[in-house]
A protein has these predicted regions:
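FabD-like malonyl-/acyl-CoA
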Residues: 1-117
Length: 119
């Protein structure tokens, strides 16, 4: 049987997403940490005390960092999807999962994409 993975776009985020993976998986932690930007991803994704996770400039990097972490967990477990797809922003995560670019590059491209949205 072949496996397909569909990466979510903006709108699937919620406070606490990825926290259990981060605490239990070195692969998730390494991928997530490589996505560092100019704000505290951990605080926004895991706690969101300021309620900013639903603001686009935070949502998109958090979603991509989370997806990169999940991709790392799948790889760590030997799961190799035959098909990858992404919905809107999820396309960046699917491309990262396909090896087109690294987790850090996916985050950098997401940040660039955000800069274009705010022009």
């Amino acid at each position: 049987m072949k496996l397909a993975v569909l990466y979510a776009g903006q709108g699937a985020q919620h406070p606490g997403m990825g926290k259990e993976f981060y605490e239990s998986s070195p692969a998730f932690r390494a991928a997530f940490d490589s996505a560092a930007l100019d704000f505290d991803l951990h605080r926004v994704c895991f706690e969101d005390p300021d309620g900013v996770l639903n603001q686009t400039e935070y949502t998109q990097p958090c979603m991509v960092a989370f997806a990169c972490g999940v991709t790392a967990v799948l790889a760590e477990k030997g799961v190799k999807p035959a098909y990858l797809a992404g919905l809107s922003l999820g396309e960046y995560s699917a491309l990262q999962a396909a090896g087109v670019f690294t987790a850090k590059q996916a985050i950098e491209l997401t940040a660039f994409r955000l800069s274009l949205i705010h022009i």
